[in-house]
Swiss-Prot record:
SUPFAM superfamilies in UniProt: Glutamine synthetase, N-terminal domain, Glutamine synthetase/guanido kinase
Name listed for the protein in its UniProt record: Glutamate--isopropylamine ligase
PROSITE patterns membership: GS_BETA_GRASP (PS51986), GS_CATALYTIC (PS51987)
Broadest EC class assigned to this enzyme: ligase
Domain GS beta-grasp: 19-115
Species annotation: Pseudomonas sp
Result of knocking out the encoding gene: Cells lacking this gene are unable to transform isopropylamine to L-alaninol.
Similarity field: Belongs to the glutamine synthetase family.
Record domain GS catalytic: where: 122-459
SMART domains assigned to the protein according to its UniProt record, in alphabetical order: Gln-synt_C (SM01230)
GO process annotations (BP): atrazine catabolic process to isopropylamine; glutamine biosynthetic process
InterPro entries xref list: Gln_synt_N, Gln_synt_N_sf, Gln_synth/guanido_kin_cat_dom, Gln_synth_cat_dom
EC number, UniProt record: 6.3.2.-
Amino acid sequence: MSEENKKQILKVRDFIEKHNIDTIRLGAVDIDGVWRGKQVGAEYFLNKAALDGTQISNILFGWDVADHLVDGLEFTGWDSGYPDIALIPDLSTLSLVPWQEKTASVLCDIQHLNGEPLNLSPRNLLRKAIEKAEQLGYKCYAAYEFEFYLLNDSIASISADQWRSINPVEKSGHCYSMLHHSSSSDIMGEVRKYMRDAGIVLEATNSEHGPGQYEINIKYDDALKAADDAIFVKNGIKEIAAKHGMTATFMAKPSAEWSGSSGHVHMSLSDLAGTPVFANPENPGALSEVGYNFLAGMVALAREMSAIYLPNINSYKRTAGASWAGGNSSWGFDNRTVSHRAITSAGSAARVENRIPGADTNPYLVIAASLLSGLYGIENKLKPKDPILGNAYKVSPELARPLAASLEEAAGIFRESEMARVIFPNEFVEHYAQMKVWEIKQSNSFVNNWELARYLDII
């Protein structure tokens, strides 16, 4: 064991003893952004898992979000016997799980048993994107903001009712209302406190437009930490809500009558010394040349990345019409109708907001796709078109290419995209597209209440 590893293990032991930890959650994120893993005892973690990792079936990348096995995958399946892959703890992610007694969590990287990083792992893909940025002389920073709904009932009671009634904690939406925010102050206060105790800063929380809808803003950090924090916060909110007998949902559009829930991500770069590079000191109302290049790359590849930014059948119900979600490949200064909002500043606050993703996305993949698209713009010195002034929803397709209108269209675009295969490994592109095609087949085979109500009697 190296001296550095010895120091890390000693720090971990001190942390466990200080907080009287007896359970460690070891987990990694799958293709769909679901955090999966194991819970292990503190002694096993210190003496084995922290040193050598642990193993888990590669079925993590062989099933869908509902744990149904996906047919025909090259990576895994019945023919291969679903063998093991390795979970390697990233000890820098060790943190308390304050809402669970004597519990801590560690995020893991995923490797083949021979030590080779797994190309399907979203966290590994983001690591590679960050490495590419560093090779070009940049560090990437990101900040997530999530919207979600708080529902009065537990997930068990909602599912027992066949998902027919979902009752939000508020009967109407009052965006930014201090009165309506106060009605859920206990649970939102717990969320802020628990995240603070876990070392994550929530800069703000507020009520949103939908009934029982809330927004959280996570403080910016380096790109990998930002994605780690986003996963921790999403899971934490769900668990905290469950302790109150409630359900927190990050579904993009849980009801046709309600506002969609976004998962916008803000991106910026610095040089390797930490100096921000998006700001334009000579013209604080504009971006730097590098900032414009990065923005142009994000806009240019937005349509091809639709399957990552809008990964589920339900995602496309959120982006239909004037919905506060980018529906085309567009940009503008401080314009919330575009897909990419440029926010100018004389200093470190200069950034680009990707407004396409919903709260249902995988943060690692969204940040990786956004970063790699931006780096493509920098490498090729792309120039953005003129900014959209006013309502981007009314702009013609000639001026702003529409994003994919359905998951079926998005999966096809992603699979056929040459650029997707330039910025991501071929293995990932094929696997991801196949998973989305599977999801479409599952949806198409289901008879829903709308069909029954429309056709059962009259046809």
